[in-house]
Amino acid sequence: MKSAEIREAFLRFFEEKGHTRVASSSLIPANDPTLLFTNAGMNQFKDCFLGLEKRAYTRATTSQKCVRAGGKHNDLENVGYTARHHTFFEMLGNFSFGDYFKRDAIHYAWEFLTSDKWLKLPKEKLWVTVYATDDEAYDIWTKEVGVPAERMVRIGDNKGAPYASDNFWAMGDTGPCGPCTEIFFDHGEHIWGGPPGSPEEDGDRYIEIWNNVFMQFNRTADGVLHPLPAPSVDTGMGLERISAVLQHVNSNYEIDLFQSLLNAAADAIGCANEGQASLKVVADHIRSCGFLIADGVTPSNEGRGYVLRRIIRRACRHGNKLGAKGSFFHRIVAALVAEMGDAFPELKQQQAHIERVLKNEEEQFAKTLEQGLKILEQDLAGLAGSVIPGEVVFKLYDTYGFPVDLTGDIARERNLTLDEEGFEREMQAQRERARSASAFGMDYNSLVKVEGETRFIGYQGTSGSGKVLALFKQGMLVDSLSAGEEGVVVLDQTPFYAESGGQIGDCGYLEAQGLRFDVRDTSKAGGAFLHHGIVDSGTLTTGAQVEATVDASVRQATALNHSATHLLHAALREILGEHVSQKGSLVDSQRLRFDFSHFEAIKPEQLRALEDRVNAEIRRNSAVEIEETDIDTAKAKGAMALFGEKYGDTVRVLTMGGGFSVELCGGTHVNRTGDIGLFKITSEGGVAAGVRRIEAVTGAPALAYLNDAEEQLKQAASLVKGSRENLLDKLGGLLERNRQLEKELEQLKAKAASAAGNDLAASAVEVNGIRVLAARQDGLDGKALLALVDQLKNKLGSAVILLGGVQDDKVVLVAGVTQDLTSRLKAGDLMRQAAAAVGGKGGGRPDMAQGGGTDAAKLDEALALALPFAQQAL
C-alpha cells in the first residue's frame, strides 16, 4: 500500500466506527502558548481532554501534521543520519472524549492492523507492551484479543520515579494522566535488536508502530492519582513508520513518499540518488519547511521563524555539500505538492508563496554566508588558541543572522571549538537589556481586579446612562474620587468602546449633578470596562448614576480608519496573495497602522494598486453588513479570524463590498464604505523578518496629506526656479551637474594623491631591505587613502605602509603590506594595533586593512607603531 492509501484507510476505518474525521490543525498551536509547534495528534484536543471545551462529537480521527525541531522536542540534528528521525511527520490518531475506553481502543487497533479488510499484518509479528500494573489492558490483550503471553511485555517505572515510565503518559506534573499500551512490529532476526524492555531494545528489529494512551487519572500535587469521571483515549501511529512496515523496508526514507522527494531533490541539486545522508536531510526538510510556510511561519531571527530559518539553511548547506550550484531548494516544492497536496490542500493553495519564500531565503543565505564568512575570517586571523570566543559567535548570530550550528560546522572543519558558555552569557545579557528597556514604570491599571461585567451599549449610539460599580485610584479600590484626582471608573453599562482588536479606547466624559469626569481612555479587565481619567469637578462615588458621553467626532474618525483596515486587508490578500495575514494593527482617529505577513518589500506599482483597490470599494459606497452568529457558521461563510484571538459562542461578522471583505470584528465601523471618503498610504516598510507594515490616513487627514504634498511640490519647484510641470526635468539636470562635479573632484583628488605619493615614497624608511612608510594625510577619506596605499605599493616594491588622517573629527586609517611579505606580517595585525591606539577597531586581509577611531589627538602615536611592528616581524 502507498502512504496515501494507508492514511485514507485509517481515517475511513475509524469513520466506520463512528468517529468524526477532523482536519489536521495548524502547525502553530492555537490553544497552547507553551508549545513551539504542534507535535502530536492530541494537541488540538487538549482542552477537550481537560474538560474545558465541548465539541459536537465524542469520537474523532485525524491525520495530524507535526514538527519536531526546536524546543523540548528537537530531532533536527539526527535527521538524515537515522532511519526514523524527521523534522516533519504525520501522526494518525483516534480519540475518545469520555466515550469508549480500553476495550474498544485495543480491539479497534488490532482489527485495523490484522484484519483481511484492512492492513493484514501477520499477528505473529506483533508484540505488545502495557504498564506494569495495568492488569485490565493485559487481560484484554491476552484473553480477548488472543496475544500470547510470550509476546506481551509489562513495563514498569523505568525512568527513576513513580509513574515515570515509557508506558505511563502525563500531560504534566499534575493533571490528566494514565497508562498506555504500545504495539511493536518485529522486522525479523536478520536485523539486530531485542524486544521492548530488553537490553537490546534500542535496535531496529522491534519498532513501535502504535501507542494507545488511556487517560483515566488526575494526578494532584501530592502525587496521588484520582480516577477521572470520564476517562478518555488518545492514540498515535506514525504514518511513515507503518508505511515502512507495509512496504517491507526498514527505513522511513525508503517508503514511496520519501523516494519521490529524494528523486526530486537529486534532480534539483544535480546529483545521483544514492542514499546519501545529505540528500535525506534535504528531502526531510522540504516537508517541514513547506508546511510551516503554508501555515504562516516566515523565516526570521526569533521564535518559530528562527527554527524555520535554521531548517532551510541546514537543507541549503547539505545541498551545497552534494554540489548544488545556486538556489535549488525551492524547486523541490512541486514534488512535495504532488505527493501531499491532495491530503493537505493548503500546500496547493500556497505553492507559489512557499517557492518564493524559499528562493528568497536561499538567496539571502548565500549573501549571509559570504558576509559572515568574511567577518569570521577576520576574527579567526587574530585568534589565539583553538576556541572561537562567545562574543564572536554572538556577533555572527545577532548582527549577521548566522546560525550558531553553522558557525559550529565551520569550526569543526578547522579543528576549532565554540565557547558555548560565552555565547550563552552574551544571549543572557541581551535578554536583560531587553527586559530593562521595557520595564520603565509601574502600570497601576494592571493592579485593577474587578468582579462582574460591563454591558457595552456603544453600537447603538455614543451616549447612555450607567451606574458606578467600582472606583480605583492607583490600582486600589476606593469609595470616591474628588476633583483633581485621577482614577478608573467601572460602570454596569457603557457606550465607551474599550481598546481591543487594535482599535483605541473611546474618550469623552461622565456627568451627574455637580460632577464631571473626563474620560481619556477606555480599556478592559476581564469583562469589565475601565474608564481612565480625572475628576474635573465634584465628587464621584460608588453607586452613583452618571450620563456617559463619548466624543463622537473621535469615534467617527476612528471608525473610518478601522473600516479602512478591513478593506486594506482584503486588498492585500487579493493583490499580494492569500498568504497575507494580519499580524497586528493600530487604529485611532488620525491614522491606521496595519502589520501583515509578507516576505519582501512591496513594489511601488503594488502600493498604487492597493490604494486604487481600496478607493474603488470606497467609491462603490456599499453598505457595511453586520451579523451576529456562531463561530462555525461564520467560518463557513469565509469570515477571517485573527490567529490566537479567543472568540465566544456568538461572534460579530462584518461584511464589506458585498463579500469583498468578511471578517470577525467587535470594533466600531462606518455604515457605508463611502463614509471613509478617501484612503491614502503614507508609508510601507518592514518591522520584522517576514512582517511588513503599512500606515495610511483616511477622510479629512487624507485630504490634508495630499494638500501638504501639493504645497511641498510647489515649494520644491520654486527652489529650482521651475514649475510643477517641469520639476522632474529641473531636478534631473541638477543631479547630472552634481555627478559631473563629483567626477571632476575625484579626478582632482587622484592627481593630488599621485603627487603626494611621489613625495611620500621618498620619506620611507628601510628596515632589512624592506621599505616602511607611516604618514599623516588629513582630509582624505578611506577610499582615497586606499588608492594612495595601492599606488605606494607599486612605487616602493617590498613595503609596509600605514596612512592615517582626520576627516569630520574622526580618524581614518589604512594599512598595506605587499604580497611578498604577507607570510611574515599581516596588514590586519598592524591595523588592530593602530586602531586601538585611537580608540577604535579595524581589520581586513593580510595585504590590506582599514580601521578608524575617535581620538584624533592620538593619531601620530598610532602612525608611529608601524616602524616597531615591521622591525619586530622582520
From Swiss-Prot:
GO terms for molecular function: alanine-tRNA ligase activity; aminoacyl-tRNA deacylase activity; ATP binding; tRNA binding; zinc ion binding. It is found in: Cytoplasm. Binds 1 zinc ion per subunit. It catalyses: tRNA(Ala) + L-alanine + ATP = L-alanyl-tRNA(Ala) + AMP + diphosphate. Disulfide bonds: none annotated. Consists of three domains; the N-terminal catalytic domain, the editing domain and the C-terminal C-Ala domain. The editing domain removes incorrectly charged amino acids, while the C-Ala domain, along with tRNA(Ala), serves as a bridge to cooperatively bring together the editing and aminoacylation centers thus stimulating deacylation of misacylated tRNAs. Catalyzes the attachment of alanine to tRNA(Ala) in a two-step reaction: alanine is first activated by ATP to form Ala-AMP and then transferred to the acceptor end of tRNA(Ala). Also edits incorrectly charged Ser-tRNA(Ala) and Gly-tRNA(Ala) via its editing domain. This is Alanine--tRNA ligase.
